[in-house]
């Protein structure tokens, strides 16, 4: 029994020490383990251990924000709640309370702080028993305070204090450094530094609108919704973003000061974040719609995003709000210059007395010079000069002009480079919405929008889309009814379409001569129409005028090289005239454009056979449309390789996945290249063939010509295999 009483007495003794450490009377000031703590200092001294305790002794971690206030001679009941790992200041009121508490503690240098008093030593046995009975207590090498709060109530009882816990007390071993909440202990906490951010301005923080960043989100106005896709913005140097950056962005986008919102927008614009800058400028305009600067800045953001038309409209609004706003005039001049409106750009550039940007002035002069040369060359029909000058004007700065792109397409069309004209037409800049104030600006003596429809109508006509050509020509005529060029085009398009319709009707009635005359009537108005030339070539073919048909096909292909119909017609004509080399050349081009057309493949095969015969080559046992032939013996393989022509032998294993995949492609090659012999050998079924050919890896391809091996490929890709087959098969 005596052995059991000793630790109990020791435990009670330590408990008394613990209770004494919680006593707030003045007579406790002389305790050797009590240290005064300056709450304004980020440093808390470590506690010394009594010699009677082991190294596992633990200590409490407490707040220093004035949760327990000491008074000489009397200690009132105080309820204390420990802070979480990351304290969150909810309002300026709590901040002032913290500051006042810190001030009180610093005034009395002899009064021990609660944080120091809670750091008194105690018995490990009692600590472990108490910790095991409480929920949320943690032990270990690294300790983190529990999220649950605990309350400690201290009541005066002579020289002792009683401790009651409503929730779990944090029993922490000595020697482990634990964040104490609001008392920042150097080296013990690794919190991220909080940056200075701009406050929303709704309250007074004592230092203007600059506050410490925190995890609190500002109050959201009901008029706007949160957008998590927006790039966060922060005033700090912390590039990692985080809650402070997000808070700064929210403060900016939901702020009530338009100048601050504009300033944030300018910062985003300088960083190249034009979409985010645009949203901030929109917010500034919402707060102050009559500010010309905000509209001008919004125009700059829109211009950087490629929305030229809307940027022009914003500049016009800014100028209406402030007619003497030089920046808006210069910005509008630059935008109009990009659209090719040189005269209007010059008006705005020289409308203010501000110093002009020499770069913009030089750009304006260059574009104006090239456009003047382009206009004169177009009137004379010198389309090569037109193409050169309009390209130079675009390169000089008018890079967003739909009309200049249309002029380039028109020049290529007149130079019979229809394929190039199509590519240019696909890349015409789109200006939406089109500035209404410049809708009647003229290009080449034509209203800008009418000129766009004018060129489109010519392109539709050249591509054989006659109905679309009529519609676009009619649209141009309605926009600019006084223009002579537009009226002539509209008239010619209707006549050409009528001639095409009449020729098609006669062709269906097999009245080929009359149909040919109808097509010729349409060619009077458009001599370079590839569609009408092809139709007339077909009529020549039907009546046996093969040479005339070839001439029309040549002319059509010169204008539009990608036109399939005249090439197919010409290949058939070459076959009729037994011009096998030209026929094979045309059919090979058609095979590339239409690889799965069996009629073209068969025509190519027969043309190749005829070409070989014309050269004196032996062409025995050559059949079109054969399948891949399976070889079952070595003698069968030798017999197959003695055939004239090229043979492709595929060595494979049926169970191999790669062989299965490539076998499907070999079947397709057999259809694409019917003049070649395709053979396959399963090396598991025919091991003697594989051994004789020394096949060790599958799939393996060997190409033979007249029994002589030309090439061997092991595990090729589909592209490499087809390239090799095409090389040796043609």
From Swiss-Prot:
TPR repeats lie at residues 258-291, 293-325, 327-359, 448-483, 496-529, 531-563, 565-600. Residues 144-154 have a biased composition (Polar residues). The keyword Repeat applies. Residues 636-722 form the Thioredoxin domain. Specifically expressed in pollen grains. GO terms for biological process: response to stress. CDD domains: TRX_family. Residues 23-168 are annotated as: Disordered. It comes from the Eukaryota. Keywords: Repeat, TPR repeat. Pfam families: Thioredoxin, TPR_11, TPR_16. Disruption phenotype: Decreased efficiency of the male gametophyte transmission and reduced fertility. Induction: Not induced by salt treatment. The keyword Translocase does not apply. Residues 45-67, 90-116, 125-134, 155-168 have a biased composition (Low complexity). Plays a role in the transmission of male gametophyte. This is TPR repeat-containing thioredoxin TTL2. It comes from Arabidopsis thaliana (Mouse-ear cress).
């Amino acid at each position: 029994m005596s052995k059991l009483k000793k630790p109990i007495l020791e435990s009670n003794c330590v408990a008394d020490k613990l209770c004494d450490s919680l006593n707030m009377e003045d007579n406790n000031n002389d305790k050797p383990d009590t240290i005064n703590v300056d709450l304004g200092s980020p440093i808390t001294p470590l506690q010394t251990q009594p010699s009677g305790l082991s190294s596992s002794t633990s200590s409490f971690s407490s707040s220093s924000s004035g949760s327990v206030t000491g008074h000489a001679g009397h200690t009132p009941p105080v309820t204390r709640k420990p802070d979480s790992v990351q304290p969150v200041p909810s309002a300026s009121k709590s901040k002032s309370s913290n500051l006042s508490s810190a001030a009180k503690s610093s005034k009395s240098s002899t009064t021990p702080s609660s944080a120091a008093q809670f750091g008194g030593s105690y018995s490990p046995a009692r600590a472990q028993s108490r910790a095991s009975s409480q929920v949320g207590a943690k032990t270990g090498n690294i300790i983190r305070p529990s999220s649950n709060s605990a309350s400690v109530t201290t009541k005066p009882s002579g020289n002792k204090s009683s401790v009651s816990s409503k929730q779990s007390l944090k029993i922490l071993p000595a020697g482990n450094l634990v964040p104490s909440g609001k008392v920042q202990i150097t080296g013990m906490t690794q919190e991220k530094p909080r940056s200075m951010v701009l406050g929303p301005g709704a309250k007074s923080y004592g230092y203007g609108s600059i506050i410490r960043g925190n995890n609190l989100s500002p109050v959201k106005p009901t008029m706007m919704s949160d957008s998590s896709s927006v790039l966060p913005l922060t005033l700090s140097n912390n590039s990692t973003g985080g809650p402070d950056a997000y808070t700064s962005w929210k403060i900016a986008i939901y702020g009530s000061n338009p100048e601050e919102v504009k300033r944030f927008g300018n910062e985003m614009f300088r960083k190249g974040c034009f979409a985010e800058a645009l949203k901030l400028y929109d917010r500034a305009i919402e707060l102050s719609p009559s500010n010309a600067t905000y509209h001008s800045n919004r125009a700059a953001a829109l211009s950087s995003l490629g929305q030229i038309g809307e940027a022009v409209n914003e500049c016009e609004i800014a100028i209406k709000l402030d007619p003497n706003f030089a920046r808006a005039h210069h910005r509008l001049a630059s935008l109009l210059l990009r659209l090719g409106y040189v005269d209007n750009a010059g008006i705005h550039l020289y409308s203010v007395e501000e110093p002009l940007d020499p770069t913009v002035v030089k750009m304006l002069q260059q574009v104006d010079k090239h456009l003047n040369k382009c206009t004169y060359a177009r009137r004379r029909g010198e389309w090569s000069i037109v193409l050169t000058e309009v390209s130079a004007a675009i390169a000089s700065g008018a890079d967003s002009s739909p009309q200049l792109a249309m002029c380039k397409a028109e020049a290529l069309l007149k130079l019979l480079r229809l394929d190039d004209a199509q590519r240019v037409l696909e890349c015409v800049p789109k200006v939406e919405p089109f500035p209404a104030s410049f809708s009647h600006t003229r290009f080449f003596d034509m209203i800008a929008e009418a000129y766009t429809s004018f060129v489109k109508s010519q392109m539709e006509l050249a591509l054989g889309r006659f109905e679309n050509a009529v519609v676009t020509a009619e649209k141009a005529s309605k926009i600019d009814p006084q223009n002579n060029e537009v009226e002539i085009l509209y008239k010619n398009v209707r006549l050409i379409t009528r001639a095409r319709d009449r020729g098609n009707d006669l062709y269906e009635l097999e009245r080929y001569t009359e149909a040919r005359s109808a097509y010729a009537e349409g060619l009077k108005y458009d001599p370079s129409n590839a569609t009408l030339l092809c139709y007339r070539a077909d009529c020549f073919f039907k009546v046996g005028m093969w040479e005339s048909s070839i001439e029309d096909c040549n002319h059509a292909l010169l204008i539009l090289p990608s036109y399939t119909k005249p090439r197919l017609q010409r290949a058939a004509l070459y076959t009729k005239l037994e011009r096998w080399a030209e026929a094979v050349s045309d059919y090979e081009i058609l095979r590339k454009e239409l690889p799965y057309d069996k009629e073209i493949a068969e025509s190519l095969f027969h043309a190749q056979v005829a070409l070989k015969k014309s050269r004196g080559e032996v062409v025995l046992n050559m059949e079109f449309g054969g399948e891949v032939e399976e070889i079952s013996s070595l003698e069968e393989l030798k017999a197959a390789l003695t055939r004239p022509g090229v043979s492709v032998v595929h060595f494979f294993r049926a169970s191999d996945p790669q062989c299965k995949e490539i076998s499907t492609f070999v079947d397709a090659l057999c259809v694409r290249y019917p003049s070649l012999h395709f053979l396959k050998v399963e090396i598991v079924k025919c091991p003697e063939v594989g051994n004789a050919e020394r096949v060790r890896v599958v799939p393996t391809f060997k190409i033979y010509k007249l029994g002589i091996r030309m090439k061997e490929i092991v595990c090729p890709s589909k592209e490499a295999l087809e390239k090799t087959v095409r090389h040796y098969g043609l």
